[in-house]
């Protein structure tokens, strides 16, 4: 029974458990000294709290309350009941949200009704029904979608342009309702995979699955809201006894759940990151003006046209298929045009089509007659400013001061500078595009303050090799390890940054592997040193952990396998990376691992191996191996220890030794303390980490040996 403390100290019964209505109005009037109006209130049947709290001036005048002072006292007291009710409702809502925000991972697993099994995801269909799908062993979006498509009822399958049912994964989309922004969010592949394999993402029990030509129906949205409210209801029953796991749900109101939803589309004039990750090339190709805001439109159009023609010529000459993962703008435009042609060809009369085309194959643009390709090129010609435009060398100028590094891959002679996609102490990283081929790139750019600093070429490379080795050894002694490094001047810092970039160039141009970021070349231009690297859509392991939290173990094994394959390739080339960590492991939107940042990497010579020379204290402290901290040896086994630390990162969402400072971590590692192995890892996972954290580097397994570990065996259903 609820009570309200009066000014005189008397408690009034205002709850629903009142046994008599008259005492309430009587006590109400006695409290404010207006009992002379009691008979009037009773005659008008204004005797309960619900009736009294809606009193106003006109009603009081009709009741005969003519004194202004009495009316004010009655109105103030009656309005306080409404205020108390609102405060009570707000307090209840606050208590609910506090319970939600205080939940931990353990509390989520308590509610088996929401996610019955560990590896299960609930997909909502457009008829309002829901399907539970086991995604264990599915490491990409295609495999997840295929499992669901096999179980779809016939009436919910997508149809192609001919009205035929299709089960191709590219014909289906996945949405999720974002109640913090009150929008429908279309998931990209990397988002779908991450949500499905995350333990703490409550969205995994209400993903909406529709065909590409549809948007989520009212029935699907209604089912999603019911599951969402059921989730909140279940979470509210758990006491505030654990950590702040679901703080992102704070601030969600009832109005958000009931308001009108909009689809979260990208705006044409706004550069968008996908969950704080680099956007895919397909998206950039549809918004070039947005991603290259300071580039002349004529130059952009010319590049698009030349890239398209270049891709079309290569397709015909080499009969090469169009790669779905290409970062080349011409390939993307060609693929889009090809899709349109396929749709048009399928719409032709079948009898007419059979007399001209092989009915067993749908011809692709790459295999069409030359005149067909010319026709499409002419269509793209409409994008150009003038069909009689000057040649590339005239357009970009003949007196360019770019000096290119000779590499196995042609260095871009002309390139378009796009939006900034990252920055650091060395400078900035920009989105770039080869002006001739249309290839998208990530361009590391650092200002060269000293005019004597130049890009090394093959002409002076051999002559300066001994000097460079000596400089490298001097640089190793004062390399950055957090608080350990104390450079004397800003000029020394800048010089070291440039040296690190030049060192990175020399190593990268020898590397050509799927799991290593591709190096396109370097140039010195306008006082800047540019390094042209492969553009990797997506983000690093570190950024994904920050956005999504720890990974599922099946996803960790998939990424670890690829990291070790890349590390094994480096070691075969006698290169030690020396800075393997989550921030230097990129994951593209297809789930492919790319190792990057070779600024402090080292190429071992046979002399290095024989002498087993004293190691320098280089790298990132929390990922350092004991022999590096003790400076006892320089071996490839340091990368194995660091890879184990990355596995710890993916398991926990934090670096090893998260409770220690850098100096404390150096002391711990130096006294043979290994990182704590997650207790929730499988027995094989724990065994893998124990081998990676072998204190004696001579007994620590190599990358090739670890690749044969049972933990990395793929168990794909």
Swiss-Prot record:
The active site is at residue 579. Its EC number is 2.7.11.25. ATP binds at residues 421-429, 444. Residues 20-84 form the SAM domain. The modification Phosphoserine is found at residues 323, 465. Residues 452-466 have a biased composition (Polar residues). SMART domains: Ras_bdg_2 (SM01304), S_TKc (SM00220), SAM (SM00454). GO terms for molecular function: ATP binding; MAP kinase kinase kinase activity; protein serine kinase activity. It is an enzyme of class 2 (transferase). It comes from the Eukaryota. SUPFAM superfamilies: Protein kinase-like (PK-like), SAM/Pointed domain. Residues 415-712 form the Protein kinase domain. It catalyses: L-seryl-[protein] + ATP = O-phospho-L-seryl-[protein] + ADP + H(+); L-threonyl-[protein] + ATP = O-phospho-L-threonyl-[protein] + ADP + H(+). Keywords: ATP-binding, Kinase, Nucleotide-binding, Pheromone response, Phosphoprotein, Serine/threonine-protein kinase, Transferase. One of its GO terms (biological process) is response to pheromone. CDD domains: SAM_Ste11_fungal (cd09534). Homodimer. Interacts (via SAM domain) with STE50 (via SAM domain). Serine/threonine protein kinase required for cell-type-specific transcription and signal transduction in yeast. It is thought that it phosphorylates the STE7 protein kinase which itself, phosphorylates the FUS3 and or KSS1 kinases. Belongs to the protein kinase superfamily. STE Ser/Thr protein kinase family. MAP kinase kinase kinase subfamily. This is Serine/threonine-protein kinase STE11. It comes from Saccharomyces cerevisiae (strain YJM789). The gene is STE11.
């Amino acid at each position: 029974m609820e009570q309200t403390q009066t000014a005189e100290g008397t408690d009034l019964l205002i709850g629903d458990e009142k046994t008599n209505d008259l005492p309430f109005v009587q006590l109400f009037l006695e409290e404010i000294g207006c009992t002379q109006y009691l008979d009037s209130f009773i005659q008008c049947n204004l005797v309960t709290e619900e009736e009294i709290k809606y009193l106003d001036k006109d009603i009081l005048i009709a009741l005969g309350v003519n004194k202004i002072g009495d009316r004010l006292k009655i109105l103030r007291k009656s309005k306080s009941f409404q205020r108390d009710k609102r405060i009570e409702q707000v307090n209840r809502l606050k208590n609910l949200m506090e319970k939600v925000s205080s939940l931990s991972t353990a509390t989520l697993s308590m509610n088996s009704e929401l996610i019955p099994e560990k590896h299960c995801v609930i997909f909502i269909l457009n008829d309002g029904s829901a399907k539970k799908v086991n995604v264990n062993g599915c490491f990409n979006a295609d495999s997840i979608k295929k499992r669901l498509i096999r179980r779809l009822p016939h009436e919910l399958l997508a149809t192609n342009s001919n009205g035929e049912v299709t089960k191709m994964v590219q014909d289906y989309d996945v949405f999720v309702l974002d109640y913090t922004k009150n929008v429908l969010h279309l998931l990209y592949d990397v988002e779908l995979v991450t949500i499905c394999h995350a333990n703490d993402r409550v969205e995994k029990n209400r993903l909406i699955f529709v065909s590409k030509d549809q948007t989520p129906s009212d029935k699907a949205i209604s089912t999603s809201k019911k599951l969402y409210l059921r989730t909140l209801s279940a979470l509210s029953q758990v006491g505030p006894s654990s950590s702040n796991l679901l703080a992102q749900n704070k601030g969600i109101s009832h109005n958000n759940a009931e308001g009108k939803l909009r689809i979260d589309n990208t705006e044409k004039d706004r550069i968008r990151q996908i969950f704080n990750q680099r956007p895919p090339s397909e998206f950039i190709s549809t918004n070039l003006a947005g991603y290259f805001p300071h580039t002349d439109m004529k130059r952009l159009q010319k590049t698009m046209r030349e890239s398209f023609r270049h891709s079309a010529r290569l397709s015909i000459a080499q009969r090469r298929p169009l790669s779905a993962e290409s970062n080349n703008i011409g390939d993307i435009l060609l693929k889009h045009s090809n899709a349109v042609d396929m749709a048009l060809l399928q719409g032709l009369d079948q009898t007419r089509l059979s007399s001209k085309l092989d009915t067993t194959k749908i011809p692709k643009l790459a295999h069409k007659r030359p005149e067909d390709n010319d026709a499409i090129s002419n269509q793209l010609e409409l994008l150009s400013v003038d069909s009689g435009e000057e040649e590339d060398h005239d357009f970009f100028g003949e007196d360019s001061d770019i000096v290119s590094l000779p590499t196995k891959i042609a260095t871009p002679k002309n390139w378009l500078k796009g939006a900034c996609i990252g920055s650091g102490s060395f400078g900035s990283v920009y989105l770039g595009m080869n002006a001739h081929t249309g290839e998208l790139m990530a361009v590391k750019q650092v200002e060269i303050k000293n005019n004597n600093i130049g890009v090394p070429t093959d002409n002076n490379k051999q002559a300066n090799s001994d000097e460079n080795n000596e400089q490298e050894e001097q640089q190793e002694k004062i390399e950055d390890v957090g608080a350990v490094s104390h450079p004397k001047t800003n000029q020394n810092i800048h010089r070291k940054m440039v040296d690190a970039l030049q060192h990175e160039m020399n190593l990268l141009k020898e590397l050509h592997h799927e799991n290593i970021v591709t190096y396109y070349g370097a140039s010195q231009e306008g006082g800047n040193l540019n390094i042209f690297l492969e553009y990797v859509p997506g983000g690093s392991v570190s950024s994904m952990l920050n956005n999504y939290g720890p990974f599922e173990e099946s996803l960790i094994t998939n990424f670890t396998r690829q990291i070790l394959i890349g590390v094994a390739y480096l070691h075969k080339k006698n290169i030690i990376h020396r800075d393997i960590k989550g921030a230097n492991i990129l994951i593209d939107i297809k789930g492919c691992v790319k190792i990057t940042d070779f600024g402090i990497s080292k190429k071992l010579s046979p002399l290095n191996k024989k002498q087993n020379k004293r190691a320098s204290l280089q790298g990132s402290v929390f990922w350092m191996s004991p022999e590096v901290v003790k400076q006892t040896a320089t071996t490839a086994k340091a990368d194995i220890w660091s890879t184990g630390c990355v596995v710890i990162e993916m398991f926990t969402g934090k670096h090893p030794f998260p409770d220690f400072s850098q100096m404390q971590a150096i002391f711990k590692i130096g006294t043979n303390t290994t990182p704590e192995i997650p207790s929730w890892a499988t027995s094989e996972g724990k065994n893998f980490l124990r081998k990676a954290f072998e204190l004696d580097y001579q007994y620590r397994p190599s990358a090739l040996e670890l690749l044969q570990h049972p933990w990395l065996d793929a168990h794909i259903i």
